[in-house]
């Protein structure tokens, strides 16, 4: 029997709660944009100081990711800092491809994607509105599971169509997260047989996490 290996590389405590709070303060999202019907919209910003902090922590990890994914790193995109206000709903997305003529077509030079949670999930009545969120789960449709936002945790995964993802509706609070992408020297092809355990990912893939 093959030893299970997760295609999700998870690093808890990548940033401290205090560092997450500082980034949220720097983003200066005050009032959400709305659509024509008054529904709040996801907003994106770039913030140079916060990007420098994240990349200073991330760059030493690149050799580990190269080995883990059997991938040769070429470069990293700018970080998009995302704000999902209460009531916001979004559509599923693929990080590097679009659905064209009934098939996925790669349209972006992205091979590995990263999402860093800056907010903390909480479904209990004792709720800290400054940094906690109810809703905002990061769902991966092909694997039928979701990650609860845990501030300071970094989720790394391949960018292709096997990893279509979405953020569930924000029921209470505001969700903040950072999203960025890595490009390889050659296009990365996700091969499921190199990541055994998809028959029961919650049991097989997440027994041990990276701190």
Language-model features and meaning:
Residues 1-154, 162-211:
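Fe(II)/2-oxoglutarate oxygenase catalytic core
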């Amino acid at each position: 029997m093959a030893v299970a290996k997760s295609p999700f590389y998870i690093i808890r405590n990548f940033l401290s709660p205090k560092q997450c709070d500082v980034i949220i303060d720097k983003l200066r999202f005050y009032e959400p944009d709305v659509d024509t019907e008054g529904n709040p919209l996801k907003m994106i910003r770039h913030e140079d100081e916060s990007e420098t902090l994240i990349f200073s922590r991330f760059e030493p990890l690149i050799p580990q990711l190269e080995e883990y994914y059997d991938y040769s790193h070429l470069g990293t995109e700018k970080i998009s800092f995302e704000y999902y206000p209460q009531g916001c709903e979004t559509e599923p997305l693929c990080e590097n491809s679009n659905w064209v003529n009934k098939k996925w077509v790669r349209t972006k030079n992205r091979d590995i994607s990263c999402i860093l949670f800056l907010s903390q999930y909480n479904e209990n009545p004792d709720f800290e509105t400054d940094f906690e969120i109810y809703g905002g789960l990061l769902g991966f449709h092909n694997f039928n599971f979701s990650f609860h936002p845990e501030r300071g945790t970094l989720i790394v995964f391949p960018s292709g169509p096997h990893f279509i993802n979405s953020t569930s509706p924000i029921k209470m609070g505001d969700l903040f997260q950072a999203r960025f992408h890595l490009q390889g020297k050659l296009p990365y092809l996700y091969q499921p047989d190199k990541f055994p355990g998809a028959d029961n990912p919650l049991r097989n893939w997440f027994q041990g996490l990276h701190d």
